């Protein structure tokens, strides 16, 4: 009888390790994807090297101006372009619109533009393409010296430009919200400071006062002194005389009676009652003081 061997399944220890490796690879791929997304979201610091290597693209108009008849490059000359190259510039200058002529001030400063300008100037200096405008000095006459200003009178605009740049840099920084707790603390501190100031002012007033000299001395002087002032336009008082009795005559049996004024007698304009006079005087005194 042939011996039949039983085939048993062997457990592979490598299966678990392979699963772990697959999981770790998936995690690593996810991390790399997230890092790439984060790098794309980031703003590039400074000027990119690719932009410096590529350089600026020269427009066709500049090539036409430099070599309109294609003497350097060769080829057919396009007469239509030569005729129409100046018309576009004239039409753009004539068409002045409010939307294009005025621009809103953003009060922000682009640092990359300044960096590019600095790099271009340095490259021109190294290549020797710098325009020596400062070195070209014209010979001065004696009359030109009269129009020159001394250094102490010249107004330097360096401070203004520095302040403008600092303000622009600060305006580009975003503000951070501190939260409600910080606002509440600021309000409490301001209220405490107000209370302290009021208390200090009251204490100063108390210290300055003395028992010998009252604070309302000037007011009391004016109030009491007003009664000693004589009025210039005061109405003239008339002393009223008592009516005289008629003299007795021989044969008069009736009692003497005072003379009566006629009933239709007109009163003078200056004649007033005593109450009205004092009331008007009081009103005038209050107006003065």
From Swiss-Prot:
GO CC annotation: chromosome, centromeric region; spliceosomal complex
Superkingdom of origin organism: Eukaryota
InterPro entries cross-referenced by the UniProt entry: Tls1-like
Region annotation Interaction with SNRNP200: where it falls in the sequence: 5-58
Residues the record lists as Phosphothreonine modifications: 253
Region Disordered, annotated ranges: 1-27, 86-109, 232-289
GO biological process, one term: chromosome segregation
Keywords, comma-separated and alphabetical: Centromere, Chromosome, Chromosome partition, mRNA processing, mRNA splicing, Nucleus, Phosphoprotein, RNA-binding, Spliceosome
Localization terms from the record: Nucleus; Chromosome, Centromere
Alphabetical list of Pfam families matching this protein: Hep_59
Family recorded in the similarity comment: Belongs to the TLS1 family.
Function, in words: Plays a role in pre-mRNA splicing by promoting usage of the upstream 3'-splice site at alternative NAGNAG splice sites; these are sites featuring alternative acceptor motifs separated by only a few nucleotides. May also modulate exon inclusion events. Plays a role in spliceosomal remodeling by displacing WBP4 from SNRNP200 and may act to inhibit SNRNP200 helicase activity. Binds U5 snRNA. Required for proper chromosome segregation. Not required for splicing of shelterin components.
Name of the protein this chain belongs to: Splicing factor C9orf78 homolog
Organism of this sequence: Pongo abelii
